[in-house]
Amino acid sequence: MQNSHSGVNQLGGVFVNGRPLPDSTRQKIVELAHSGARPCDISRILQVSNGCVSKILGRYYETGSIRPRAIGGSKPRVATPEVVNKIAHYKRECPSIFAWEIRDRLLSEGVCTNDNIPSVSSINRVLRNLASDKQQMGSEGMYDKLRMLNGQTATWGSRPGWYPGTSVPGQPAQEGCQPQEGVGENTNSISSNGEDSDEAQMRLQLKRKLQRNRTSFTQEQIEALEKEFERTHYPDVFARERLAAKIDLPEARIQVWFSNRRAKWRREEKLRNQRRQASNTPSHIPISSSFSASVYQPIPQPTTPVSSFTSGSMLGRTDTALTNSYSALPPMPSFTMGNNLPMQPPVPSQTSSYSCMLPTSPSVNGRSYDTYTPPHMQTHMNSQPMGTSGTTSTGLISPGVSVPVQVPGSEPDMSQYWPRLQ
């Protein structure tokens, strides 16, 4: 043991590169594991790396041995010709067999021991080599047939090779008709080709059968598996082994079943979420581009120009004083109170809402107050001059705004009315 090869690990333990742990340390690792200590605790107690502890325990659980593997040089070959022949025999008996099943049969039949049993990856490598050898043998047989056919066609044509030479139309074809005694040989070769084709068909069928048949579960097994799946979607190795002993199934089959069942559960959960979202989404109401006239009534437009409302005729009388006073005003814009009011029936409280009155002319006598007329009823009344009787008209409050007012029909005391708004 050289000092240059020794060292101290991260936990403070001493190790030697390339050399296994002492048997005493290995025995302590196994004893602590049997006492219930976790690998991380064993690593801290014995100052051995966690990877080393896990590797020793894994090999102990798998083979029951704590001895180290062979060190130095190449590992002994475990895939001996005898083991390879056995693997090929098992594969021929059951083409859908798994590598771990072959490994179990090698152990149960005593072909190998725990020390020289090949790993699952080694068995898979042997199976791949056997399949490639079969394919290579089949391709070599096909090449032999092609070479044989090439040799026969060389006697049929005028020149040797893969493709016989074509005869010229003017050239007599005696050479192609001469070999008559080789007909029997040709029939023999055809029959041999038929046998080889049958073998090729059998090989193809065997290759198709390499896929493992689906495992069929009984109702009791399915119920037990579903019950365990309801408890947990990811059972540990102990739960799988307990379930395997209960329903008489290999632990690997149970692991594959749980993997497939989880995939099915994810698909079903996705569909449930889609249905839930579809049920929560409200149905779309089509929006109509046209509105009913009963809901939104059109606002009537004035039929006469705005300039006509500036004259005295819009008051419904021919008073010269009013005509002179209103004719000097600028033209009114089209936005008037009558046009902007909503179309609603008159309310009794609105009949006296407008109390601003216009002064009457001294020449007008014997007039009475008229009731308030809504704007939608006076749209066509503004353009027609009325008589000398009192009518509803619009009076100016400010430039650009006109409101309907009541014109007094008599000469009462003007002190009870508001003065004209300036």
UniProtKB/Swiss-Prot annotation:
Annotated signal sequence range: none
Keyword DNA-binding on entry: yes
Disordered: region residues: 170-200, 268-289
Gene Ontology annotations for the cellular component aspect, listed alphabetically: nucleus
GO biological process, one term: regulation of transcription by RNA polymerase II
InterPro entries, alphabetized: HD, Homeobox_CS, Homeodomain-like_sf, PAIRED_DNA-bd_dom, Paired_dom, PAX_fam, WH-like_DNA-bd_sf
Compartments where located: Nucleus
Polar residues compositional bias, start-end: 185-194
Molecular function GO terms recorded: DNA-binding transcription factor activity, RNA polymerase II-specific; RNA polymerase II cis-regulatory region sequence-specific DNA binding
Keywords associated with the record: Developmental protein, DNA-binding, Homeobox, Nucleus, Paired box, Transcription, Transcription regulation
Cross-referenced CDD domains: homeodomain (cd00086), PAX (cd00131)
DNA-binding region: 4-130, 210-269
Region (PAI subdomain): 7-63
Region feature (RED subdomain): 82-130
Function of the protein: May be a transcription factor with important functions in eye and nasal development.
PANTHER family: PAIRED BOX PROTEIN PAX-6 (PTHR45636:SF48), PAIRED BOX PROTEIN PAX-6-RELATED-RELATED (PTHR45636)
Family: Belongs to the paired homeobox family.
Protein name: Paired box protein Pax-6
Recorded name of the encoding gene: pax6
